[in-house]
């Protein structure tokens, strides 16, 4: 079943509430089309799956465990560099489109607080 904009809007709103103020603990890229972000709130730990798989693109919380490659791909290393330890500030969506923005407050190499946005455009 294709993911429509209305369903994605409800998912984004629920993620915003559930993951409010969560911090990124880990990032994994189990496959070329999937990114798993482990986020911790004060009381819970969640695994957020961002999947760009053809025919099943989605953003959701998951309890599924994934087998990760021994050597992380370059994209995963880049995401770790810029997002690990970041605090989730906002989850928002482009109205009527299937683009979800995850805004994080992170610390850069100089120790300054910066805002990084991870954009998930879900097609297919």
Would you name each region that the model predicts?
Residues 1-124:
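Gly/Gly-Pro- and Ser/Thr-rich, intrinsically disordered tail segments characteristic of DNA damage-repair
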């Amino acid at each position: 079943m294709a993911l429509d904009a209305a369903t994605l809007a409800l998912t984004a709103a629920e993620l915003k509430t559930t993951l409010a103020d969560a911090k990124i603990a880990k990032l994994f890229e189990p496959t070329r089309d999937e990114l798993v972000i482990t986020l911790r709130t004060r009381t819970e730990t969640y695994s957020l799956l961002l999947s760009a798989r053809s025919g099943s693109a989605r953003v959701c919380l998951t309890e599924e465990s994934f087998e990760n490659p021994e050597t992380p791909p370059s994209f995963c290393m880049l995401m770790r560099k810029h997002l690990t330890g970041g605090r989730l500030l906002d989850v928002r969506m482009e109205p009527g489109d299937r683009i979800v923005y995850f805004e994080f407050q992170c610390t850069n190499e100089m120790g300054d607080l910066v805002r990084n946005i991870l954009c998930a455009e879900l097609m297919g």
